[in-house]
């Protein structure tokens, strides 16, 4: 959906600057929230975080459908939608990555990580291509497809039966915010 939003922005405004703003609005949340999302993924039920992210994507798709069909979709709405998508993705990706090791055995983890990586790469390549083919029939159809897929993904996440391992609710400190960076740096 993120690529289609950019295409529609360009179709509406014919401005490369506005197209760049869409990319910026989608990227800035990941940068701004990078220290916080790890804390959230570690402290709360990852399934609920994923459902929340998918609900945001579903709602954004509905707004984009309504705006496209109603003829009121413009630059500001697209930028706000891009910011919403970027924020949802900022929480979704790290949460998905943190959930997988909790779902499979230690022995199966390397294969599961390889499969998840292959699936993500396939989706990254095929998603925009398929979206482009659907976009020919109209942007609202792409957003409708994304809305349906979001609901399907929510249903699949709700089927995950993994007890949430509760983390001690220590106060969030600067040290805890930077702990993830320290862990990565030590590797």
Over which residues does each language-model region extend?
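Alpha-helical transmembrane-bundle signature of multi-pass membrane transport and export proteins
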Residues: 1-187
């Amino acid at each position: 959906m993120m690529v289609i939003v950019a295409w529609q922005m360009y179709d509406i405004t014919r401005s490369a600057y506005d197209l760049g703003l869409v990319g910026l609005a989608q990227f800035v949340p990941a940068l701004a929230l990078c220290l916080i999302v790890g804390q959230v993924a570690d402290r709360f039920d990852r399934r609920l975080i994923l459902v929340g992210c998918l609900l945001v994507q579903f709602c954004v798709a509905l707004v984009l459908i309504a705006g496209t069909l109603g003829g009121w979709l413009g630059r500001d709405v697209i930028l706000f939608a891009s910011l919403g998508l970027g924020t949802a993705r900022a929480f979704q990706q790290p949460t998905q990555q943190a959930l997988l090791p909790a779902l499979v055995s230690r022995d199966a983890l390397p294969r599961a990580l390889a499969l998840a990586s292959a699936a993500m790469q396939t989706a990254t390549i095929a998603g925009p291509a398929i979206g482009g083919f659907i976009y020919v029939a109209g942007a609202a159809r792409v957003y409708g497809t994304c809305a349906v897929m979001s609901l399907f993904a929510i249903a699949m996440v709700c089927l995950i039966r993994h007890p949430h391992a509760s983390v001690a609710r220590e106060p969030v400190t600067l040290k805890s915010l930077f702990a993830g960076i320290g862990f990565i740096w030590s590797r």
